[in-house]
Amino acid sequence: MTTSFGPATTSAPLKDHKVQIPSFHGLRSSSASALPRNALSLPSSTRSLSLIRAVSTPAQSETATVKRSKVEIFKEQSNFIRYPLNEDILTDAPNISEAATQLIKFHGSYQQYNREERGSRSYSFMIRTKNPCGKVSNQLYLTMDDLADQFGIGTLRLTTRQTFQLHGVLKKDLKTVMGTIIRNMGSTLGACGDLNRNVLAPAAPLARKDYLFAQQTAENIAALLAPQSGFYYDIWVDGEKILTSEPPEVVQARNDNSHGTNFPDSPEPIYGTQFLPRKFKIAVTVPTDNSVDILTNDIGVVVVTDDDGEPQGFNIYVGGGMGRTHRLETTFPRLAEPIGYVPKEDILYAVKAIVVTQRENGRRDDRKYSRLKYLISSWGIEKFRSVVEQYYGKKFEPFRALPEWEFKSYLGWHEQGDGKLFYGLHVDNGRIGGNMKKTLREVIEKYNLNVRITPNQNIILTDVRAAWKRPITTTLAQAGLLQPRFVDPLNITAMACPAFPLCPLAITEAERGIPNILKRIRDVFDKVGLKYSESVVVRITGCPNGCARPYMAELGLVGDGPNSYQIWLGGTP
């Protein structure tokens, strides 16, 4: 069985403190569609991987004068991601400068404006949290819920990387919102920007050794690659010291420079002044559990256990990534491929070596080609492995055999394995608002529950006592929050990015358009006689950057222009 991939061919200033987002009234029906040009085949087995790719990445000239993108200059002149952001946030202007717009990404925020309004731009900021494994404390959830009402647009957005997004925050409120998150067990540091982003792991709170080990490893990797120079706290809480603790193995791995990985005299020992060439994404999981879309990450880490279920080490994949540019076939989505196996005690050193290889060799002249996947595509996996091993100080061991991957959503009621239960609630496109927002707060607050965000934009209520199951089920049902068996299977697995009206990269609808699109797909299924239970995974993005991972969907719709999409078929999430 093979899986085929291929392309089908300014408003008035705000008077109120909240950004008003208009409703969407549907896409115009269109019979026009681009036709496939090149079919790109991918075996479904993880043991014989091919790549999603079109052509080779253009090599950077070694003889020409080294050029750098504008963002590289901004980073160099920023005093470790401080200037001019630290000055811009103090002005009365509703927006920040071009340089500060790039720097604030490292702090976990994007400057946006409502693209459906004409005239002068109504600027606001999207704030994204960083939650390794999707873990969210009770205190942080209630804080985010409050902030959405007080400073946002009244909704919370769950992302495909297990984080919150808070839209519509005005510049004058940024410091208040950021400081509130920091002081309530949260962080936005590194949720965006040219560094390691949120580290994914299965969200299910299963009391199994492999799951617990995967989640702890994800948290350790996140700590290892967190910025160290203090710029985040200097700007948002005036340098206030936030007490945190790190496992000693994380500190040791970060400080180790026995193979030339570090900048020894820098406040950023791993990143230096320039950080990474581009964003960097990592996921950790256990065999069979592909809730994290493991092969779409720059680094994919898989726990390997012995026959008794004891973790022994990790298989590592490298070079995945979804983003591309329309009609530029030197850009492409790509699946990660195996680089090798490492013992469990070496995982932090191996990950650090891969990150440093990208830091030193990734392109910094053209950001379209700056992701790790293009370096590996240009070099080939053998050369890449050889260079990584120099920083790692060891040879990778042969990749261990793995079973086939399965898509896991963890919706509904499940036993954790420690005497407690968890409940996975489906959230259409990750948007928590209205009655759902009110009811979730009521349940989470009443029972003092922690939650987890899944990579499929859903939410899990954790550590539920058996006696609470019935009243929680009743409360959710009375609010119209349906159990999975009552939700259309198309909706259960569908995902869409926010797109219009706030995303600056969107070229058509995604989140606001997907309800109507799914209804039309269901109508087609009914006409051809497909059973209700027979479904496909549908993912929609408003641009080719692939935030909802559409290239891995069985049916992927990728925005190609106003009210038009490329159609990508045959993925296996």
Curated annotation (Swiss-Prot):
Protein name: Sulfite reductase [ferredoxin], chloroplastic
Subunit structure and binding partners: Monomer. Interacts with ferredoxin.
EC identifiers of the protein: 1.8.7.1
Annotated family: Belongs to the nitrite and sulfite reductase 4Fe-4S domain family.
Co-factor remark: Binds 1 siroheme per subunit. Binds 1 [4Fe-4S] cluster per subunit.
NCBIfam families the UniProt entry points to: PRK13504.1, sir
BP GO terms, sorted: DNA replication; negative regulation of DNA-templated transcription; plastid chromosome packaging; sulfate assimilation; sulfide oxidation
Keyword terms, alphabetized: 4Fe-4S, Chloroplast, DNA replication, DNA-binding, Heme, Iron, Iron-sulfur, Metal-binding, Oxidoreductase, Phosphoprotein, Plastid, Thioether bond, Transit peptide
Gene Ontology CC annotations of this record: chloroplast nucleoid; chloroplast stroma
TM ranges: none
